[in-house]
Regions:
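Short, charged interaction patches at domain edges and termini
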Residues: 248-263, 277, 284-286
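Residues at beta-strand starts and edge strands
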Residues: 194-198, 244-248, 275-277
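Short proline/glycine- and acidic-rich turn/helix-capping motifs at secondary-structure junctions
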Residues: 233-243, 279-288
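Short amphipathic alpha-helices in soluble, non-transmembrane regions
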Residues: 213-219, 260-270
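Solvent-exposed, membrane-proximal periplasmic/extracellular interface segments of envelope transport
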Residues: 116, 235-237, 242-254
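Inter-lobe coupling/hinge segments of SF2-like helicase ATPases
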Residues: 1-201, 206-211, 223, 250, ...
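Short secondary-structure junctions
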Residues: 63-66, 221-230, 272-276
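Generic structural signal for residues in well-ordered beta-strands
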Residues: 68, 155, 229-231, 279-281
Length: 288
């Protein structure tokens, strides 16, 4: 089927039903949803996926007598709306709370006895070596919303892979098991804490210039660094294009290399005044 994509970014648009428009969450581009397919001109259009709006609609259909509140960037964007929703929840004005990750962290909702997580696989499949760790932390946090005080709680996690190790560590509250497993994977693949990382992101509005310069950076690094250091890339960043700017990334893995700092300083100075190319350097990045 046809997928609406942002003309400025390498990303699909997200449908917001309340405003009946599709929006890019990277550059803010919006377009009104059409009832006719732009590709084949068919009128039988349906939207797929499971965002908070669709979950809210589905829950209200299943439980029409229950009061439901949705807590996400749309419902909390106006001044004071975030605090108002929290106060209403604390005052027991709602039976069901639907939200994004923001409801999992740092909030203490009394009388919550059931927590459901939809599509837990999504964060596990992110192209980041910390995806397992981050998923374990998030699911452990959201699980802690259920059964506060003397109340018993229950947590239901939806997944297409119930045998996944990380999800089973969450199920069994096995912190040490998750730690041991993650450390084993990182040691085998040489990821932190068994090495240091440097992420270099090169971006430009001109793809040809970007490709040439990104490869120059890689060649320079491979000449300058010790043989024990690994230079990976250049590869396309995710997303590849944001607001009409193309992006490549280069990753350096190293343990001990006295040439790292001089090489990074040289690259930083070399492109500091270049209007066609932007170079961002992140030492030990939290995400890659």
């Amino acid at each position: 089927g046809y997928t609406y994509k942002c003309p400025h970014c390498d990303i699909s648009l997200t449908y917001h039903k309340t405003k009946n428009h599709l929006r890019c969450h990277y550059c803010g581009y919006t377009v009104i949803k059409s009832d006719i397919c732009p590709n084949c001109q068919e009128k039988s259009i349906d939207d797929y996926g499971l965002g908070t709006e669709k979950v809210e609609e589905f829950v209200k259909t299943l439980y029409p007598s229950y009061s439901v509140v949705r807590m996400d960037t749309d419902t909390t964007s106006k001044k004071g709306s975030h605090e108002r929703i929290i106060k209403d929840i604390e005052a027991h004005k709602y039976d069901i709370i639907i939200g994004t990750q923001m409801i999992a962290k740092g909030l203490d909702f009394p009388n919550v006895t059931l927590v459901g997580v939809v599509n837990a696989d999504e964060s596990l499949n992110l192209p980041d070596f910390r995806s397992g760790e981050n998923t374990f932390n998030l699911l452990t946090q959201v699980s802690g919303r259920a059964g506060r005080g003397n109340l018993k709680g229950k947590v239901i996690i939806q997944t297409f892979n119930p045998e996944n190790k990380t999800l089973n560590f969450v199920k069994n509250a096995d912190y040490m098991g998750n730690y041991t497993y993650e450390m084993g994977v990182r040691h085998m693949l040489s990821y932190p804490p068994y090495c240091y990382l440097v992420l270099i992101r090169v971006s430009s509005k001109d793809y040809d210039i970007l490709s040439t310069e990104a490869n120059k950076v890689v060649q320079y690094l491979r000449r300058s660094l010790n043989e024990s250091s690994k230079v990976l890339g250049p590869t396309t960043a995710s997303p590849f294009k944001v607001n009409n700017v193309f992006r490549f990334q280069i990753i350096i893995k190293y343990k001990f290399d006295e040439n790292i700092k001089p090489a990074i300083d040289f690259i930083d100075k070399e492109y500091a005044m270049n209007r066609d190319i932007s170079v961002d350097i992140d030492i030990n990045p939290l995400r890659i």
